[in-house]
Amino acid sequence: MNRDSPKRGARTNMKRGILVLLSLSVLVAVALFTANKWAIRHETIAFHDPDRDNRLVAVQIAVRRDKEMQANAGLIKLPVAVLNHGNTVKNTEYSFLSTVFAWRGYLAVSPQHDLPTDPPMVTKVGEPYVGRLPQIQRGVANIHFAIHEMQKVQPNADYEKVTMVGHSMGGDISMYFAKEYPDEIKKVVTLDNLRVPFLTDGKFKILSFRSKDTHFKPDPGVVPDDEQCEQAGITVVNTGFQHNDMRDTGPDAAKSSIESMLDKFLQESDKSGALKPVPTNVPDILTASPGPVPLSVPLASNPTPNKSVPN
């Protein structure tokens, strides 16, 4: 009798188990890619504003195909989320955010705010928002124009009250828009906005992700204290990530943490139970909503920083 047979058999079973796990991982990755590619439609539409010298406003949209078909048939109205990019960053660099909204049944609209022909943004101490007001107001004009044009493209969407989202400068645009046009806002999500103070009147819920970045600090008075946040329905998530980790080029740990908390926020704040992840022929684990992330607790630490982007 060969005494090594049981050991050899155990090693063989172990190798077989590892191969099965590797194969399953590949299958899961392929299924996720296939499901996302099929279920969510992405498109870039170019609009030109005749009231501003025919200015180009490119809009990236993301929408669930099944929800879009229902909207086209007049069965539902799509909730709308407007995603605003950071300074010098493209509107296409936040697909990890637009995908969360699309899975939840939103029409995600991402306008391109700055163009190569625009003058550079200059910091001016002592001026409103350290000289950023012209760029912020330009962003607000872009949003209104994009919404106006999107009503022609997809009339069966709720443009009267939108969810405003933005990173860095885009977060400032979002908060300023909400300040100027509160009746057009459903809720606000910002990722490390630095200049425009949060609204504390409690008219709508606010979720804000804050970085742990010594190079990007909010101006005094931008982020309310804990007591004000509690009274106004503001949720502040203090992360361990860098300012520029909060976009597609950031580490997976940062994006997955933000996705999870954002999905939980949308689940709790959206009253309609119909906005659920689309059924597919892939395992439930691939389409289930991410689990919750504790509030006010660092989500990760020591990520690899991206190249700094001026704000």
Where do the language-model regions lie?
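Conserved alpha/beta-hydrolase "acid-adjacent" motif
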Residues: 215-221
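Catalytic histidine neighborhood in serine/cysteine hydrolases
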Residues: 228-245
